[in-house]
Amino acid sequence: MSRNSAAGLENTLFQLKFTSKQLQKQANKASKEEKQETNKLKRALNENEDISRIYASNAIRKKNERLQLLKLASRVDSVASRVQTAVTMRQVSASMGQVCKGMDKALQNMNLQQITMIMDKFEQQFEDLDTSVNVYEDMGVNSDAMLVDNDKVDELMSKVADENGMELKQSAKLDNVPEIKAKEVNVDDEKEDKLAQRLRALRG
């Protein structure tokens, strides 16, 4: 392997490690912002339902963003580990080449041609990966992380309210919800708490 190829591989390893750290930092930032939105949700629960839902949606988006960032960081770490192995192989091969200049046959038995071919494939794959990682910020977080299910919003609002001994401030929609007759309620429904029933009625 040429010096340029070796330097390129080591540079890719550096870029991968740097990218992984940056993704971890962004994940930590998303985690802090998730907590901030959750705290805002706690304060708004008994004041305004619409605002509460906005804070709940924001918290869920930040949670999804954090998970996406951590998954991507894990993938980058995995590839960096393979690059590190490739760099080590190159260093070992170079050392042996300097020490055993006259041992051509021994080196041939190590199948250096195959090692070179594998390294060439490694470099090409990692150059492509490096390009993909560099455009990450232009792409933004995976679109799935930006979608928030209304059921998850309701679930988070209910959870926060329960944890803080609060009762959700309901909208005027509840005034028009028909009263559920006892005979229409099955055993499982009777076991559900009142807050969950109100949330279902609100979504209806």
Swiss-Prot record:
A biological-process GO annotation: ESCRT III complex assembly
Predominant location: membrane
Region (Interaction with VSP24) location: 1-103
Cited PANTHER family: CHARGED MULTIVESICULAR BODY PROTEIN
Region ranges (Disordered): 185-204
Result after altering L199D: Impairs sorting
Taxonomic superkingdom: Eukaryota
Protein name: Vacuolar protein-sorting-associated protein 46
InterPro entries: Snf7_fam (IPR005024)
Residue ranges of the region described as Interaction with VSP4: 104-204
Biased composition (Basic and acidic residues): 185-196
Gene name as annotated: DID2
Other observations noted: Present with 2440 molecules/cell in log phase SD medium.
Assembly information from the UniProt record: Self-associates. Interacts with VPS4 and VTA1. Interacts with IST1.
Disulfide bonds: none
Localization per record: Endosome membrane; Endomembrane system
Family listed: Belongs to the SNF7 family.
Entry's Gene Ontology cellular component terms: cytoplasm; ESCRT III complex; late endosome; multivesicular body
